[in-house]
Each structure stands twice: as C-alpha cells, then as structure tokens.
Amino acid sequence: MKKFPIALQLYSVREDMGQDFEGTLKKVKELGYDGVEFAGLFGKSAAEVKALVEKYDLVPISAHVPFVDMMADPEKVLGDYAEIGCKFVAIPYLTEEYRPGTEGFQKTIDGARLLGEIAKKKGMQLLYHNHDFEFVKLDGKYALDVLYDTI
C-alpha cells in the first residue's frame, strides 16, 4: 500500500518550537510526520532551518506568515521561506485595520498583489487562510472573492 505523506502545522506546537526548535522538529519526525508547515522561525536563519529540515528529513511544505511581517520586508521574508524550500506561503489572518470594510483593506489588496508577484518569482504560491470576516459583500462582491482574484 502506498503511504500518504502527512505534515504537521507547527502552530499546534508553537510553545515547544519556541523552547526547543530543533528538538521539536526531531520529535515531529519521530512521531511519523513527513513534512511541516511553519508558523514562525523563532529567531533562526533560513539556512539554519533548511539544515534542520534536511537533517530530520522533513519536507517544508508551507508557512503561515502574518501579513504585516511579510509586508515589512517582502523580498527577504519570502526569500527566506523559498530558501528553506517552502512551496507555499499563507497570510494566516488579518488584524482589524486590514479587514474588509476598513480603509486598510485596500492595503491588503495591494499588498497581496505584491506578495503574490514576489512569491511567484521565487517559485512559491501565495495562499490566504480565510475566516468569517471575509464573507461580507463589497460593491456586490464577497471580500474573499476580491482577495482570491488578487492572489
């Protein structure tokens, strides 16, 4: 029977990652996981993280990175995750000032467009983790559809 690869969203073990990054990755592998989705690098460089996922034979599937963190230095942040080997990077959540129905939502749309372009140049795809607040209509169109059309 063919084995179906399973990855762990590291947000679920974020406290452990903060205390013992390498030890947690080792344990994740020992538990039988094949890959991981990052939720922060906890002060580690991309090169350090890449070496660790290679050491423990874990596939770096993707990463959830806060929108404001990506927008602070898009080239570097997305470059780091590309260096690690992630194929996907997701905006996990929007703080209230960037949500649909606020003046900041246009910054979200513009930022997502930029992030998507940079991600594509680096061989990755930008994703968006939706929530209930994207299901409001703006000019007759759901905000989530506006975001997806942008990404």
Language-model features and meaning:
Residues 1-88:
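N-terminal pre-domain/capping segments
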Residues 35, 67-151:
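Active-site acidic/histidine proton-transfer and metal-coordination neighborhood
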